[in-house]
Amino acid sequence: MTRSPLHRLIFGGLRRLLYLWVRSETINQSSMTLNLDRSRPVFYALPSPSLTDLAVLDHECTKAGLPRPVLPVAVGPLQEPAAFFYLTPDPDWLGRQDKSGAPPTLERLVAAVSQHAEEDAQIIPVSVFWGQTPASESSPWKLLFADSWAVTGRLRRLLTVLILGRKTRVQFSAPIHLRELVQHNKGHARTVRMAQRLMRVHFRNLKTAVIGPDISHRRNLVKGLVHAPLVRQAIADEAQRENLPLAKAEAQALRYGNEIASDYTYTVIRFLEVVLSWFWNKIYDGIKVNHIEQVQGIAPGHEVIYVPCHRSHIDYLLLSYLLFRNGLTPPHVAAGINLNMPVVGNLLRRGGAFFMRRTFKGNPLYTAVFNEYLHTLYTKGFPVEYFVEGGRSRTGRMLQPRTGMLAITLRSFLRSSRTPIVFVPVYIGYERVLEGRTYLGELRGASKKKESVLDIFKVFGALKQRFGQVYVNFGEPIRLAGFLDQQQPGWREQDHGPQYRPDWLNATTTRLGETVARHLNEAAAINPVNLVALALLSTSRLALDERALTRVLDLYLALLRQVPYSPHTTLPDGDGQALIEHVRSMNLVAEQKDALGRILFLDEGNAVLMTYYRNNVLHIFALPALLASFFLSSSRMSRELLGQYVHALYPYLQAELFLRWAPEQLDEVIDQWLAALVEQGLLRQENDVYVRPAPSSRQFVLLTLLARTITQTLQRFYMATSLLINSGQNSLSAEALEDLCVMMAQRLSILHGLNAPEFFDKTLFRHFIQTLLQQGVLHTDTQGKLGYHDKLGELAEGVAKRVLSAELRLSIRQVALHRDDGLESSTI
């Protein structure tokens, strides 16, 4: 457009039109500060084609008294129609750019200077930045359109000018003298490449300083994936299996790579930081972080894989936000393909999310591309985040680990263990989770709704509620090499080829998942809502006098301070009364006043919701509650008998709640808890016998409330064992037993007013049955029917009668005896 007088006239008109809106400023704008030789021709190099950048450059050159880029210039006999060129060619309308080849102007300049020893040309690299630096910009809207490393199309450039044009900055850099490069006598082609390389490095370094580092690997990595040997083999297999041309199979692999890969952009990270800072302080009362210093210590020199628990969709953003705010590199986050929605998906991808399908089954090409993508992230040292639970917990409990991502990680480490991998568990605790009401609907049988862009606007409906604080605790790291040394001592000497899949992989991956889950539970952040829910849900009427509730909460705090669950577990500040006031301010408890004081209770709307928050910390109280349960039906019990019964039930509690202690550590922990219960007056010790308080005493009420914490879990155990025994040997399959357990639990919840949907959660029964099989209490015959060991009867009656009331045991046995009637009536 600037190569003729007419073009320059049109260009001048466009520049004046542009400056009706744009305002620009420059750094190093004079020939003195640039150290220019005004007797030598000056050229300007812009990194990529942009008419608006050229107009801004021309305006600033005129203002600073520098030679204009749109005017002709001569280098010896060479006449150039304009004094500028672009280092890379023009992108198409889709933003695609071919960076091969050299600018023709640069080719001619090098030739002219080489052929005429007295000539020189000064090339000034010029960078134009639209808007403030991302680090100083506070407007999330402007950050979305701020300069980034991604190649952009014309439409986005237009929006950038309109939104950010009032704060445009031009950076003139020190000139490159072509004469100095030519004097190296490297030949024409190498001199041109040398000049290009100097300018590319310069532009990159300057851009890094201004807008932040290029943390995206997408543009190069995706193309590299299809050339990896394992992916090449998968492409060939796909072409043969589906009878496709090799090019089509390769194109499919490339599409998979683009579907999967994240596209980290510093400006989007800053955008999310600004938006989330508002979010955490507007909807929540901020974030409380514990133990992050250990991550800051191990991050250098390690491949860090963050494995948080999964409670809410905002978990995806929370950890990245915290790490960025604390000077750590935000991770690449595994997200379900269901979140790859219009607008939101692109924003998440540029914030570091990579997307994965729910199942890889039947698609070996996709599997190969995904595995290679993760392997590349690991070997290049990019931090990664994924959720071992798979989906969000709807009950507040830790879900059984899904081991797929762990298996991919383990196999990748066996392929290349040069960079040590460390798993960092991250416990995320909410005083009120955004999706709480949705979870309750799903537990009650409502179908899971597909995610939608419109779900974002539901957040604004929550602004009227108070959501309390968010707690983030970093747990004890798990070094993968050390874990493998314990599980498979000879793993380093084995032949670890790219396709290596050892026989011990599945079992070791399962144990790794269980270890991660235990470490997550060890890092639990106990908050006021958890403790109030625990106390009120243990009462028969979901209500307590305020003074009584205060005593219960003070007791729980005292017990937890005396016997901490783990060094990474955290407790709330304040006493029981402070906890009550905090929960009241969130409108999670109702109250009624009378002449004797205030009664706090859970109304129908909040009663079920509060089971979610109780379940967050159920594992913390499992062992003391179990010990307390033995004294509901027995006034005294020896230490030996207590230990015997706890050891009998512990494997099942540990499997469901991911309790941290190994069986050989159990006796020591039992003694610690018994000592704490004695100190708090809930038990009395007489030599080797423990005695409960008088049934009419306040201490007995407190002991009973503590015991009821674990009652529903023990009831489920008793239901399953009663159904098995009443059905007889080899009469039920595991699936049939699950269905019967769910039906019985639903009936009992009505008969006994157990308003907790997870009481009849099928997955809990399924896992209990699996644990019985693992413990050798159950076995399956050739028809898949369940047989049981004699000790099942001991577990069902000998132990159950010690921890469950006679009324409950009778009710469960009656329902079990009449299960056929129940099945028949349920189908009418």
From Swiss-Prot:
Keywords: Acyltransferase, Cell inner membrane, Cell membrane, Lipid biosynthesis, Lipid metabolism, Membrane, Phospholipid biosynthesis, Phospholipid metabolism, Transferase. Pfam families: Acyltransferase, GPAT_C. GO terms for cellular component: plasma membrane. Pathway: Phospholipid metabolism; CDP-diacylglycerol biosynthesis; CDP-diacylglycerol from sn-glycerol 3-phosphate: step 1/3. It is found in: Cell inner membrane. It catalyses: sn-glycerol 3-phosphate + an acyl-CoA = a 1-acyl-sn-glycero-3-phosphate + CoA. One of its GO terms (molecular function) is glycerol-3-phosphate O-acyltransferase activity. It is a peripheral membrane protein. A motif (HXXXXD motif) lies at residues 309-314. It comes from the Bacteria. GO terms for biological process: CDP-diacylglycerol biosynthetic process; fatty acid metabolic process. SMART domains: PlsC (SM00563). SUPFAM superfamilies: Glycerol-3-phosphate (1)-acyltransferase (SSF69593). Its EC number is 2.3.1.15. InterPro entries: GPAT/DHAPAT (IPR022284), GPAT/DHAPAT_C (IPR045520), GPAT/DHAPAT_LPLAT (IPR041728), GPAT_PlsB (IPR028354), Plipid/glycerol_acylTrfase (IPR002123). PANTHER family: DIHYDROXYACETONE PHOSPHATE ACYLTRANSFERASE (PTHR12563:SF17), GLYCEROL-3-PHOSPHATE ACYLTRANSFERASE (PTHR12563). The HXXXXD motif is essential for acyltransferase activity and may constitute the binding site for the phosphate moiety of the glycerol-3-phosphate. Belongs to the GPAT/DAPAT family. This is Glycerol-3-phosphate acyltransferase. It comes from Pseudomonas putida (strain GB-1). The lineage of its organism: Bacteria, Pseudomonadati, Pseudomonadota, Gammaproteobacteria, Pseudomonadales.
